[in-house]
A protein has these predicted regions:
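N-terminal Rossmann-like NAD(P) cofactor-binding subdomain of oxidoreductases
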Residues: 1-205, 237, 309, 316, ...
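Charged docking surfaces used in two-component/phosphorelay signaling
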Residues: 187-361
Length: 361
């Protein structure tokens, strides 16, 4: 790489946009040159546009404070300045679909944190350690969009990161039925306790749309490319309940699994700790050295002890044991705004850069 790639962050003032910017500070491959947000923020210094709404636990990086926020709707103006963009915009689904396609059509690759395009037939939805081969569908997408280098790639929902990688590590034993309950942090809703005081000491047994995503998205990730589309897998059957809990960061999952070929507990643990994907082989800057860790203590994984494993990019598993109804049960934990959101998108971008899908304009 002759120079760092120039990056724009769309939706830069929101919580996920802030997290993306924090991760891009001092990145070896990328340099943020554009922060874009709603017309209300456009024209202001980034620090002024965010005001008192900086939600990260680390200070706002100095390099971004004086950047003048561009209007996210000025697609051509933003596209002229950047090699690619991260999308974390807060709009309706149809608006997100339209604006991400508009950027792609200016020959600007879009790596999206949003759900709008997750079921667009030729848009890859990727966890780089699980299904990087789905990025091959980008060639079909470019034909549809009429582009040479512009495309959209997305990362999946934050809720599935605590169990989909685990089940993927056990694929050869053919999981057939999976029952999941997720316990999801408030940052998944873009909130802190300051914004959402009624969550303190409270549990809300419903998160809109989350259960459907948690049941269906893993099947698309385990699907295959057929012609110009990604065809989802048909198994395992997954049923899920999603609960909002009074935790700032970290989604926990309690999971029950039935296998076609029941393995031993030792075999399952071995598969977890030995699991490596292409990001590890390629030594991508944001890739965890160890993707999944297995903890033997009865009281692990815990959010307060384990959520930052591998800088929030690893998955922690514990309490694997045989079950009285299913074959096995376990607890999984992942960082919802790192592995589950901004970090997952950044890892996708790094993989796409390493494989020359994203290049300097």
């Amino acid at each position: 790489m002759d120079r760092k790639l120039k990056v724009g962050v769309l939706g830069a003032t929101g919580m996920v946009g802030q997290r993306v910017l924090s991760l891009l500070e001092n990145h070896p491959w990328y340099e943020v040159v554009v922060v874009a947000a709603s017309p209300n923020s456009a024209g202001k210094r980034y620090e002024d546009a965010v005001g008192g709404r900086w939600k990260m636990t680390t200070p706002m990086p100095k390099a971004y404070k004086d950047l003048i926020v561009m209007n996210v709707n000025d697609v051509d103006a933003v596209a002229k300045e950047v090699d690619f963009v991260f999308s974390a915009v807060d709009m309706t689904k149809d608006e997100i679909k339209a604006i991400e396609e508009a950027y792609a059509k200016t020959e600007t690759p879009v790596v999206s944190n949003n759900s709008a395009h997750r079921w667009t037939k030729d848009v890859p939805m990727v966890v780089p350690e699980i299904n990087p081969e789905h990025f091959a569908i980008i060639e079909s997408q470019k034909k549809r969009l009429g582009t040479k280098r512009g495309f959209i790639a997305v990362k999946p929902n934050c809720s599935i990161q605590s169990y989909a990688p685990v089940l993927n590590a056990w694929k050869e034993f053919e999981p057939e039925e999976v029952v999941v309950t997720t316990y999801q942090a408030i940052s998944g809703a873009g909130k802190t306790f300051k914004d959402w005081p009624e969550m303190e000491g409270n549990i809300i047994p419903f998160i809109g749309g989350e259960e459907e995503k948690s049941e269906k998205e893993p099947l698309r990730i385990w699907g295959h490319i057929e012609g110009d589309e990604i065809v989802p897998a048909t198994s395992p059957k997954i049923t899920c309940q999603c609960v909002r809990v009074p935790v700032l960061n970290g989604h926990t999952a309690a999971v029950f699994v039935r296998f076609k070929n029941k393995p031993s507990k030792e075999e399952l643990i071995k598969k977890l700790v030995e699991y490596k994907g292409e990001p590890q082989e390629l030594n991508l800057p944001s890739a965890p050295k160890q993707f999944i860790q297995y903890l033997t203590e009865d009281n692990r994984p815990q959010v307060s002890l384990d959520v930052d494993f591998e800088n929030g990019m690893g998955v922690s598993v514990g309490r694997l044991r045989e079950d009285t109804i299913y074959d096995y049960k376990f607890i999984g934990l992942s960082h919802n705004t790192l592995r589950g959101a901004a970090g997952g998108a950044l890892l996708c971008a790094e993989y796409l850069t390493a494989k020359n899908f994203i290049q300097a304009k």
